[in-house]
A protein has these predicted regions:
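Negatively charged, low-complexity tracts enriched in Asp/Glu with abundant Ser/Thr
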Residues: 1-26
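A short, exposed loop/beta-hairpin motif centered on an aromatic-Gly-Thr core
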Residues: 47-61
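Charged, amphipathic alpha-helical segments
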Residues: 26-32
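Short intrinsically disordered terminal tails
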Residues: 1-2, 102-117
């Protein structure tokens, strides 16, 4: 993988469980790439909140997605990013272009607490 390896805590959208994973920094500050806990897919994740933005079949597509959404300041809180309609439009467009597996930038009950981080 390209980028510095770090450890982050992510919030599983299906269960709101917090899980620690190894991740890699990307060219976009605030966005990291990691393998899913079950090893099924790769995700581009908002580092500050641990919220998955999009999932892909391979790490290279996830890295390309992270670079493609780099026009925004991903070091902001998750709440600020979710509230920005331009971010949402860009994320949806880039997911379609790069073949994301799942459309996410959410979470379960844990979301409200995590997004403020």
């Amino acid at each position: 993988m390209i980028g510095q390896r770090i450890t982050i805590e992510i919030c599983r959208a299906s269960t709101s469980e917090l899980v620690t994973v190894d991740a890699w920094r990307t060219a976009t500050p605030g966005v990291v790439v990691h393998e899913s806990p079950g090893g099924i897919w790769w995700a581009a994740t908002h580092q500050r909140s641990g919220t998955v933005i999009a999932t892909f079949e391979d790490p290279y597509s996830a890295m390309a997605f992270a670079a493609a959404i780099g026009e925004f300041d991903w070091t902001r809180s998750g709440a600020a990013l979710v509230a920005d309609p331009a971010v949402e439009r860009c994320v949806i467009r880039r997911k379609r272009e790069l073949g994301a597996l799942v459309t996410v930038f959410n979470g379960g009950p844990e979301r409200a607490r995590r997004l403020s981080i």
